[in-house]
Amino acid sequence: MTLQVIDCLGVVLAGGLSSRMGQDKAQLKRRQNATSPSAKSAHSMLDFSQQLLADAGIKNIVISGDNHQIPDRVPHAGPVGGIYSVLSHYPEHLQPKALLILPVDLPLMTASALTELRLKGELSHKATFFSDSQKNMHHIPLYLPNNAFLNMFLMQAFHREKLLANSKNNIKKNNKNGPSVRAMLEQVPHQAIASLNNQVLFNTNTPEQWQQAQQKF
């Protein structure tokens, strides 16, 4: 069987600490669903997120996070650390051409919005993310081409990977070892596209935000 390079790999980021939520955000139950006809009610946010990517036309999907398919190579390195871990999971000759990255805490996201993000990114060959009606930038969800700019940034950002991994037991859980998504985007060709619906960008980091989102399902 010959393995083929993946054109666009779907990535669910599920490795956050969920400290403000008080429980694993990936396992929160989304009891009704008005945004994705294929997903059933009472699915976890992890299941919902995977289904969104599938409904957006993504055939290959992985989950990033210590308790999931691709564990973090660098502890507590944030979303960029998850991206680095995913790309490091694939040998050089099977590197995906691009990633469509979705965090596990966007319960109002839609497959159509993700499809638009992917298509705009594929046409431009640029990292592509949403801006809302107030011109605020939302750097995730993100369509991210896997190119030389990204590879150079990740190599420089995580060249101390082994040192950090060896000191894992000495790192406080609240410390962040990875760069921000914004810092990464500054080093790669990128564009923001206007979101047609600000609601899809509503993220849930606290129980109060989760309750607000539930009222909109």
Report each predicted region and the residues it spans.
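Conserved alpha/beta core of the MobA/IspD/sugar-nucleotide pyrophosphorylase nucleotidyltransferase superfamily
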Residues: 3-6, 163-217
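Intrinsically disordered, low-complexity terminal tails and inter-domain linkers enriched
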Residues: 31-43, 92-95, 156-176
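Conserved nucleotide-sugar donor-binding
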Residues: 137-152, 207
